Amino acid sequence: MNQTKYIFVTGGVTSSLGKGIIAASLAKLLQARGYRTTIQKFDPYINVDPGTLNPYEHGECYVTNDGAETDLDLGHYERFLNVPTSQANNVTTGRIYLSVIEKERRGEFLGKTVQVVPHITNEIKERMQLLGKSGDYDIVITEIGGTVGDIESLPYIESVRQLVWELGENNGIVIHLTLVPFLAAAGELKTKPTQHSVKTLMESGIKADILVCRTEYELSEDLRHKLALFCNVKREAVIQSIDASTIYDVPNLMLEEGLDKVALKKLDLPEKSTPDLKQWNEFLQKHKNPKHEVSIGLVGKYVELQDSYKSILEAFIHAGATNETKVNVISIHSEFLDVNSADEQLKGLDGILVAPGFGGRGIEGKIETVRYAREKNIPFLGICLGMQMAVIEYSRNVLGYTDANSTEMNQNTSHPVINLMEEQKTITDKGGTMRLGAWKCHLSENTLAHKIYGQSDILERHRHRYEFNSEYLEVLQKAGLKASGVNPETGLVEVIELENHPFFIGVQYHPEYKSTVLAPHPLFVSFIAAAVKHKNK
């Protein structure tokens, strides 16, 4: 292919309809037909990136290989496509305006009055085409965050209108995702909200090429025809997206509806071969027909909102399918867990994961959880802060350093077993200043970590400011807490494990970010296998 083709996905009626899942499913089908496909997300908030956003506000912050702190939808893109994303795959209004203002300060606009049109829209269009111009992709799918009609989304909608016009016929299309609600009182599905949403889009100068309708019930042929007529699309371009039991069903549902065929036809591209979803369907088969079942305790401080730990929950699904095991995740709030309630809240679990996080709230509950898992020989996995809590717990309860802590929680502790990284000590800004992205780690032979990975050198993604204090390495190792993985350049301890425990491992990095449908993360796979073994013992 000479020219990259563009697909824009907008949403109407309400937020949280699943634009990211539809975009990822379409990308999966196009990829399975042999097209090099990527997805990017444009978010209309003024934060430069989601790195400083409260997880309750926006869910998990997803970190890419190149160290970008991005929207959790990029996690879906990677899990579906098994292809890494980068900073270029996620753009916010904050980043757009920051770039334009910096250009103005440098005098790049030659004294012109800087306006939303053309300066902001030009910046948006430039970034929309960045991945396409790299030559690496045949098709770029762009998801526009928010809902059509929102004030925040207007510059993006205008940019899409201009870009579709500039690209020319068959080079750019718009998919509009909308809701067809069921009205119980009338006992029928209603198309009016969709009609109004499409009308709002048309008022902005954009005609939807394909309509994807989220619905609880099947759309009748009459209803599809009505939507096609009033929304000005072809009948075959009215696509039903019925509620599914798992998001991993959606590519098959879209294949049945012919979404990929309609998109290719409108882009004037050949269908090539039938999508090869063999491995995908093998995963689904295992996921839906488990032979085992385990209960895993997810101990964290943001458990009220499931999206806060989205990648961890998805990694459990991937690892569960590999082990032909149904993984029941029990969310446990670390703030409400202590010595007195630990047994009541944690007994009966087949494995315990202590989640990442920041700040002092709920820390003592996490430390108590580690003690419980260690003493009761329950399979344990600690991620980032969870690994740090394991070091603190061992220092307190095995070495007898009763006030051992992280300087993040207590700057005056006499045993700072977790300390602020040296390069972080001069940093004052919060945004984008942590140790981020993929870093090397060397695993020692004859360790659990080496056995899990089956290799000595790995690359994992990080997001932290604090680290294992190497001054305590020797004394902790002598006491049985092994540092089985270190950064080969800095000596930073990345992995810790217990020798005399069936499965006890803590990692400073975030393995959940790299787990995908076709490549489940070995740490999660081994953790679930250990949980199955523990249950059957």
Curated annotation (Swiss-Prot):
Allosterically activated by GTP, when glutamine is the substrate; GTP has no effect on the reaction when ammonia is the substrate. The allosteric effector GTP functions by stabilizing the protein conformation that binds the tetrahedral intermediate(s) formed during glutamine hydrolysis. Inhibited by the product CTP, via allosteric rather than competitive inhibition. Mg(2+) binds at D73, E143. GO terms for molecular function: ATP binding; CTP synthase activity; glutaminase activity; identical protein binding; metal ion binding. Residues 1-269 are annotated as: Amidoligase domain. Residues 295-537 form the Glutamine amidotransferase type-1 domain. SUPFAM superfamilies: Class I glutamine amidotransferase-like (SSF52317), P-loop containing nucleoside triphosphate hydrolases (SSF52540). CTP binds at S15, D150, I151, E152, K190, T191, K192, P193, T194, Q195, K226. NCBIfam families: PRK05380.1, PyrG. Belongs to the CTP synthase family. Catalyzes the ATP-dependent amination of UTP to CTP with either L-glutamine or ammonia as the source of nitrogen. Regulates intracellular CTP levels through interactions with the four ribonucleotide triphosphates. This is CTP synthase. It comes from Flavobacterium psychrophilum (strain ATCC 49511 / DSM 21280 / CIP 103535 / JIP02/86). The gene is pyrG.
